[in-house]
A protein has these predicted regions:
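A contiguous, surface-exposed recognition patch within enzymatic or periplasmic domains that forms
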Residues: 1-32, 149-203, 210-213
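Hydrophobic, proline/glycine-rich low-complexity stretches
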Residues: 1-90
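HotDog/MaoC-like acyl-thioester-processing domains
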Residues: 2, 74-162, 226-233, 237-267
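Small/polar glycine-rich anion-binding or flexible loop at a beta-alpha turn
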Residues: 32-36, 204, 219-233
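Terminal targeting signals and extreme-terminal segments of soluble enzymes
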Residues: 54-66, 193-202, 206, 244-246, ...
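Short, basic/aromatic beta-hairpin or loop at an interaction surface
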Residues: 62-74, 195, 206-218
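Short conserved catalytic/interaction loops centered on acidic-Pro-aromatic/His motifs
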Residues: 104-106, 216-220
Length: 267
């Protein structure tokens, strides 16, 4: 175990998240946290002195900080939920690095890291999670497609405005100081992006919320991939479609380019 932390799960982070997303908050003491809402608990809270120029912690974090000349991206993951994680009770999260693999990509060397989290409460494992992290050279550029025409929103789609305030509040709720999400000058002048980057976890959470519209019970396997960067000016459109093998979810920008995809397989 590389990291372990225990805390009492208070209702306030969940209530703040519900306000941020304009979604209903369930009875947190009985129904427990909805799918992926555990991301707002048991957080790493580094000291200000331990942050680098980009806002990333530079030491004592899991996964490891990017290091000089490298950037870190959340590429996807899988969350297995065994039951409700309830507020008002203590919970423990144990984190390990499961694997590290170096590969050569089209834009340069890549390092793939798999981080595993296990969240327990009242002596039972409630959440098992795998996060896929990718490190790349800072000199390699992300592919940014032209926006193109705006497409209409279908009846089964959920449009979300990606505003600077939304990104800032999401960063605050997750104690994420990475400047690419709220500092437009830094995004443009240092990292060369055309706008503020939408958090990968925010896209995954939006897909989970769209799936919650079809099924409240968080139990099951949710697997997701982040396939393309999403910038604030491009907007976010979320969709969830029930099927015989589960609920298929996706995120696209307002121009039709898919940026994330996921599947919830209920138990």
């Amino acid at each position: 175990v590389r990291d372990e932390r225990t805390e009492i799960l208070l209702p306030e982070p969940a209530q703040a998240l519900g306000a941020l997303l304009d979604v209903p908050v369930p009875d947190l003491a009985t129904d427990g946290l909805p799918l992926l809402w555990h991301w707002f608990y048991l957080l790493d809270r580094p000291a200000q002195a331990d942050l680098g120029p980009d806002g990333h912690p530079v030491r004592d974090t899991v996964p490891a900080p990017p290091g000089p000349g490298r950037r870190r991206m959340w590429a996807g993951g899988r969350v297995r939920t065994h039951g409700p994680l309830r507020c008002g009770l203590p919970a423990t999260k144990r984190t390990t690095v499961a694997s590290t693999q170096d590969k050569q990509g089209r834009t340069g060397p890549l390092t793939f890291v798999v981080v595993e989290h296990v969240v327990s409460q009242a002596g039972s494992v409630v959440v098992e999670e795998r996060q896929d992290i990718v490190y790349r050279d800072a000199g390699s550029q992300l592919t940014v497609a032209d926006d193109g025409p705006v497409l209409p929103v279908a009846e089964d789609e959920w449009p979300v405005e990606i505003s600077p305030t939304l990104l800032f509040r999401f960063s605050a709720l997750t104690y994420n100081a990475h400047r690419i999400h709220y500092d437009r000058d830094y995004c443009r002048d240092v990292e060369g992006y055309p706008g503020l980057l939408t958090h990968g976890p925010l896209q995954a959470l939006a897909m989970a919320e769209a799936a919650r519209g079809h099924r409240d019970d968080p139990r099951g396997d949710f697997e997701y991939r982040l396939t393309s960067p999403l910038f604030d000016h491009q907007g976010m459109v979320v969709r969830a479609v029930p099927g015989p093998d589960g609920i298929t979810t996706s995120v696209r920008d307002r121009h039709g380019r898919q940026t994330a995809a996921g599947t919830l397989r209920p138990w």
